Regions:
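Hydrophobic alpha-helical transmembrane segments
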Residues: 1-130, 325-391
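Cytosolic catalytic regions of ATP/NTP-dependent phosphoryl-transfer enzymes
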Residues: 13-28, 130-224, 242
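Conserved ATP-binding TGD loop and adjacent catalytic N/P-domain core of P-type ATPases
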Residues: 18-27, 208-210, 242-381
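Short beta-alpha junctions and helix-cap segments that line functional grooves
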Residues: 117-119, 192-193, 263
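Short, small/polar residue-rich loop motifs at catalytic or cofactor-binding pockets
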Residues: 125-128, 200, 232-234
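Residues within well-ordered alpha-helices
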Residues: 179, 217, 236, 263-264
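A short, polar/proline- and glycine-enriched secondary-structure boundary/capping micro-motif
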Residues: 223-227, 259-261
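Helix-loop-beta junctions that constitute the ligand-sensing/allosteric loops
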Residues: 230-239, 272-273
Length: 391
């Protein structure tokens, strides 16, 4: 973990915001500080405290059982019972039942540049929550590129470039840089947009220079009554219409990043987490994301544009407990912290439960042996076999 932070160029934090969406907490990203990690680094976890308490209780129980054996069968029997009770009361693998899962998770998080802020972070990252996803989470900067453009109608390419870029600039999102590139190539200029509207179904619209302008997917244009010739039907493209007439088809290339795909798959696979889409790019529809990332989108929430704008304005509380830290901006760095925390907590609690049951059962067996005086059962092979059963 320290090595991960040492190599960090940028440092982000992961915090939990209560009542973020429909009375459910949201997991937000903010600015991180190394002190947030150091404050929790050496704190003793709940499972470690339980392990220490059980070790003390098992020591007292072993002494009591050996005292009983001494009273019934003499000092030699008491020594045998004490030494064996200490072995079976705490199965050998109990000492790595907490550290081994933590080490495996730390190694995995190191690969994506993330650390969890102690057991506090593990515990608070568990439970049901919504995870807001933005344009840069799905398609980081540089992965969305212009793949060609074809103009239609009587309007000039320079005018079309200015109109489309202006509307995209008003909408925001991952397509802004793409249309800025188109605008620069055509030496156009940004124009004021009136009555901007995000339809929330794969398209946007507005009034520019008195003309109604629509930008959207093929399905959106057809739903809006814009005539689209058969030869222009491209799935991954932005269609532009001015005054109800198709004027351009801008082909867009979306490169699928491995980190984004891995993060989204891991997020959807977790039943306690709900992906909340706050993207501004109207191309990122439910069907497009499902096809692009090969995932089932029924658990993804696509709120209306008003809700998206309101939630996008919510920032991480600087006074909130920092639960994890990331040194990268990709989706996997954040999601692996959240899903890994749940897996680690389950593994630690299950490991504690199994080994405590094994230890208590071992003490009960030793109590019976001490009472009956059956010292012949306390052979190295029998003790080894018992240890192996609980590993």
């Amino acid at each position: 973990q320290m090595d991960t932070l040492r190599k960090a160029v940028t440092l982000g934090s992961i915090v939990k915001s209560p009542n973020y969406y429909e009375n459910r907490p949201g997991i937000l990203k903010g600015q991180g500080d190394v002190d947030d990690f150091m404050d929790t680094y050496a704190q003793v976890s709940g499972p470690e405290k339980l392990q220490s308490i059980y070790a003390f209780i098992s020591l007292i129980a072993s002494l009591g059982i050996s005292a009983l054996a001494g009273m019934l069968h003499g000092a030699n029997m008491a020594v045998q019972i004490l030494s064996t009770s200490l072995l079976v009361a705490v199965p050998a693998s109990y000492f790595v039942s907490l550290t081994r899962p933590a080490a495996l998770l730390e190694r995995r998080l190191h690969m994506v540049g993330s650390v969890i802020c102690g057991w506090q972070g593990v515990k608070k990252l568990c439970g049901k929550a919504v995870v807001p996803l933005r344009d840069e989470d799905m398609f980081p900067e540089g992965t969305t590129k212009l793949n060609g453009v074809k103009f239609y109608g009587t309007r000039t390419p320079d005018e079309i470039a200015s109109v489309t870029a202006s509307l995209i600039e008003e909408a925001g999102g991952g397509l802004v840089n793409v249309f800025r590139t188109l605008l620069t190539r055509r030496e156009g200029e940004l124009l004021p947009v009136e009555d901007f509207r995000n339809y929330g179904v794969g398209g946007i619209g507005g009034i520019i220079r008195g003309d109604p302008v629509l930008l959207g997917t093929l399905d959106f244009m057809q739903d809006m009554g814009v005539s689209v010739p058969d030869g222009t039907m491209v799935n991954q493209a932005v269609y532009a219409a001015i005054d109800g007439e198709l004027c351009a088809v801008v082909a867009i290339s979306y490169a699928k990043m491995r980190s984004s795909a891995a993060g989204l798959v891991s997020l959807i696979a977790s039943k306690r987490l709900t992906p909340l889409m706050l993207t501004r790019d109207f191309m990122l529809t439910e069907s497009f994301l499902g096809s692009k990332f090969s995932v089932k989108t029924r658990r993804m929430v696509f709120p209306d544009q008003e809700t998206r704008d309101a939630l996008s304005a919510v920032t991480a509380d600087p006074e909130a407990d920092v639960l994890a830290m990331t040194t990268r901006q990709d989706l996997a760095s954040t999601v692996y912290c959240i899903t890994g925390s749940g897996a680690l907590r389950s593994a630690c609690l299950l490991g504690n439960a199994i080994h405590i049951v094994g230890g208590v059962l071992g003490l009960l067996i030793m109590l019976a042996v001490a009472y009956l005086g059956s010292a012949q059962l306390l052979t190295p092979i029998n003790i080894l076999l018992y240890q192996l059963v609980w590993m």
